[in-house]
Amino acid sequence: GNTVGVLVADANRESIMKHVYAGNRLPVIGFSNNGSLRTPRLDMNGDGKVTVREVDSLMALQFKAAHETLTGRDVKRVLAEQFRRDDGRLERRWLGISSNVTYRYAECGTAGESGNADAGVDTDSGADTNADADECAADEHAAVRIANLAVDGRPIADDDLVIIASNSYLLQGGDSYPAFRAGTNYGELDMPYSQPLHEYLAAHQGLTAVVAVPVGTQA
């Protein structure tokens, strides 16, 4: 299912770069969520081709293609919201994240163990490590902290602005991702949220067999 999620996220990113923001000053990240995809398979009948009907069946809800702007700090909060603790185990719900994004994550330390919380994170500077530890301390519900966030190979600082491309449901905090609600400059396109994938598949023939690698590696 995550392979399709990454594909949809890449399509969302390309659509916003085509219809809304054609510049290169701000990085653009695409997101998709499992709650907006009705099946983990894009080629539902396995014939090696993806039809308009299959895309429309995959994405049949009444959402719009949408965009907003987040800070790097809020992007990290979104990424952290994929993770939950359940009976002491770390569980992950997969967001579809565009393939131009990389990051690392590590579990927040338990109470009284904050000194060990960042031991496993591969950070380049002590300042970054301290900032990440502060984020764990600031949100007692955080299961992980996010480090080394980069878009298109460029490190993203907490105060950097990032354009987010997704669907109207997710960007309004749907699927229990409230960090998206911190966004500014929210806007919806006059198109259903399936349209970016239609355009993407038309522009990139032969993508039906793509196997995307989920982003986000554990430290």
Question: Residue spans of the language-model regions?
Answer:
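Catalytic centers of hydrolytic enzymes
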Residues: 1-122, 128-219
